[in-house]
Amino acid sequence: MACIVGHALASPEEDRVAFIALYREKFPALPLENYVDGALMLSRDAKAQFDSIMEFPPFQDDIGRGRKLWEAPFRNGKTFSSCFADGGRNVAGNYPYYDSGSDLVVTFEMDINACLRDNGETQYRFNDKATMGTITAYARTLSDGMLVNVRVEGAGALAKYEQGKKLYFTRNETGGGGTGIGVANGPG
């Protein structure tokens, strides 16, 4: 297959279709619905071990701490849920998104910090697992089962998509985690 980076005119939808075709060619027996499991879809044993662990997830205490942060009132009485549609339910799958006003790709974590800032609170460090890590882990559970709904709409968003695509394939030129997907043989 042709290089996706070299195919600069491919739309995000064309890239998505090319990726699906590549994986269906490499793993024809695996249903598309299993792709959500990532590498676990390639090993029944690994998937069974994961499912067993998830019966009593070792991170449940962290989720609980995140919930406490999510529900704790700010000094002004509001909570994180006031910053997100439907209190944060079914929103995480809409990230990241492109904001044309700032010309930035906005992550869920960036909007969590915007919520803190807008409510007069100190923002969390992105690498602080005790705050940002736990609140993000909890907040994402509010979107469990939600399909990913990332959109690339408009010239600015498309430019950011192309930048991300170039970065991804440059970093994965010789890698791809053993999938063989890299600049030299990615879909396109």
Where are these regions (language model features)?
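Post-cleavage N-terminal segment of exported redox proteins
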Residues: C3-D61, D99-T174
